[in-house]
């Protein structure tokens, strides 16, 4: 489920404070990585912005249904700061969402901030209505609801949903799901042979907006079109970026406005 929007009384003032420096930091990382193609392009309906991990989950001594779990107000204050930034950066076109992951590691809860390009996200739900319809999702469903359900779904449905919503081609999503099913069924857990199609970002040419394809597969016009469109957006970003670089860091909010 999503992080609650209401706050305890001693945290409510923190929630309402918007930290521009934190917003610049989040956006700077986003623009330098694959979220550029959500923030300044329509290639990716959603992208990762920031990974967080805090000691707020149950530890091994706690039981299901316990009322008093998280005592770390300082950690919750940090989360509320990120929530305030998400709220401040969201508008009619983009939505920033903080989603807690289902799995925990001891008492550590992992969370992720995502940015959604709402119209493109809705189009993707419509395109794959036969898949997303099983939860009653339509193009009008709030992305926050979609992600809160998908994150807690079964493994393969979760993987397929994220594959579509991160903007990977249908054939790549099919391959990823089926190849991992085969690997799971194999007693030796042997990885199915594959190649990778990498789309460059400012931070590097590989390992960010990247998807797997069958070993024998040759990239087609769809892959080439994605690459060319991304390259055009990245070139524009590279040209503008230096003008917004200051000794204190990248003035990412102003740069993002210029890129829109």
Q: Where are the language model's segments positioned?
A:
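C-terminal motif of bacterial Sec signal peptides marking the signal peptidase cleavage site
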Residues: 3-4
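A conserved ligand/cofactor-binding region detector
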Residues: 8-161, 170-260
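Conserved phosphate/anionic-ligand binding catalytic regions in large, soluble enzymes, centered on
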Residues: 165-167
């Amino acid at each position: 489920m999503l992080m609650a929007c209401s706050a305890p009384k001693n945290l409510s003032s923190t929630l309402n404070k918007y930290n521009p420096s934190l917003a610049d930091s989040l956006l700077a990382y986003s623009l330098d990585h694959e979220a550029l193609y959500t923030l300044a392009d329509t290639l990716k309906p959603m992208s990762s912005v920031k990974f967080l991990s805090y000691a707020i989950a149950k530890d091994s001594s706690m039981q299901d249904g316990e009322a008093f779990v998280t005592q770390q107000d300082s950690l919750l204050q940090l989360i509320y700061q990120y929530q305030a930034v998400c709220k401040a950066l969201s508008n009619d076109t983009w939505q920033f969402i903080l989603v807690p992951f289902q799995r925990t590691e001891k008492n550590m809860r992992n969370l992720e901030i995502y940015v959604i390009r709402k119209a493109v996200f809705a189009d993707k739900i419509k395109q794959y209505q036969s898949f997303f319809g099983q939860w009653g999702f339509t193009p009008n469903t709030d992305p926050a609801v979609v992600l809160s359900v998908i994150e807690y779904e079964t493994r393969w449905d979760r993987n397929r949903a994220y594959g579509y919503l991160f903007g990977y081609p249908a054939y790549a999503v099919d391959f990823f799901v089926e190849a991992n099913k085969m690997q799971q069924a194999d007693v030796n857990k042997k990885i199915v042979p594959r190649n990778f199609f990498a789309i460059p970002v400012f931070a590097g040419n590989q390992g960010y907006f990247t998807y797997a394809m069958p070993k024998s597969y040759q990239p087609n016009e769809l892959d080439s079109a994605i690459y060319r469109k991304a390259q055009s957006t990245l070139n524009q970003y590279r040209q503008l970026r230096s003008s917004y670089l200051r000794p204190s860091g990248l003035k990412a909010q102003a740069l993002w406005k210029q890129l829109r």
